[in-house]
Amino acid sequence: MAKQIALPRSQTSPLFQWRAYYEMTKPKVVALMLLTVLVGMCLAVPGTVPLVPLIAGMAGIGMMAGSAAAFNHLIDRRIDGLMARTYNRPLPKGRISIIKAISFASILGTLGFIILYALVNPLTAWLTFASLIGYAVVYTAYLKRATPQNIVVGGLAGAMPPLLGWTAVTGEFHGNALLLVIIIFAWTPPHFWALAIHRKAEYAKVDIPMLPVTHGVEFTKTCIFLYTVLLAIACLLPVLVGMCGPVYLVSSTLLSAGFIYKAWQLKFHETPGLAMNVFKFSIYHLMLLFIALLVDHYLWV
């Protein structure tokens, strides 16, 4: 186990401590996730989303997502300290003790669950709890270290937010919400595999069997390209069932074409930094795609 690091007094101040807790929630990841939750809520109703499910749902789901991220930090603290991308995280640096981190993650998740159960509905509370377990336990603690298909199988937990938003408003499952889940499920592998190519040596160093480590970079590039094509097809499903109109169709087509082009470049060109470019583009792809869903919905209601 890594030795606890002695920190300057400024780094043990309450303000610095709260910044460390905030960092443990992976705020940028949660923000993108909450965008997909919001879109799920808005697409579930023809008009304005009711205020209580909107506020309580976003708060509760966000808190439980932050809790899952904090548990991820806890479980991965050893390997995080050995990887250049993550060695500055609060736990490897000793900015937060393990006991405090466990308490923080547990309290945050519990409060989020209570908010969802009491103010939204039990279905959303339990689905969000299942997503937390899927990400923090099934993926982080087991799949990540067990199989190169970790991100494919474990990606289902990360694809749930639009469904959570939908059930928060309606209290029931709907096929249209599952189409949004399919989109994120197909988006997840090329997103993470691009990062895994860029960080291949680091994953190999800590014995994490990411696809580039176990099957090679070229095979992973091929998989990324094939998954971007699969994603492009998945992005058309909302149009095919009449859920979306021309604004989304044009937007998703352009975004899919851009993602496929980036993946093609990655596969057939050896330009340095292309894998990281694909990773960054994938983030904008998902963000803009869900914004297009939102705009299209309110233009064509």
Curated annotation (Swiss-Prot):
Reactions performed catalytically: heme b + (2E,6E)-farnesyl diphosphate + H2O = Fe(II)-heme o + diphosphate
Cellular component terms (Gene Ontology): plasma membrane
One of the protein's GO biological processes: heme O biosynthetic process
Molecular function GO terms recorded: protoheme IX farnesyltransferase activity
Keyword Cell inner membrane applies: yes
Pathway(s): Porphyrin-containing compound metabolism; heme O biosynthesis; heme O from protoheme: step 1/1
Enzyme class (EC, first level): transferase
NCBIfam families given in the database record: cyoE_ctaB, PRK04375.1-2
Keywords per UniProt: Cell inner membrane, Cell membrane, Heme biosynthesis, Membrane, Transferase, Transmembrane, Transmembrane helix
Highest taxon in the source lineage: Bacteria
Keyword match Transmembrane helix: yes
TM stretches of this protein: 29-49, 51-71, 96-116, 123-143, 151-171, 177-197, 223-243, 244-264, 281-301
Role summary: Converts heme B (protoheme IX) to heme O by substitution of the vinyl group on carbon 2 of heme B porphyrin ring with a hydroxyethyl farnesyl side group.
Name recorded for this polypeptide: Protoheme IX farnesyltransferase
Other information: Carbon 2 of the heme B porphyrin ring is defined according to the Fischer nomenclature.
InterPro entries hit by this protein: Protohaem_IX_farnesylTrfase, UbiA_prenyltransferase, UbiA_prenylTrfase_CS, UbiA_sf
Membrane topology value: Multi-pass membrane protein
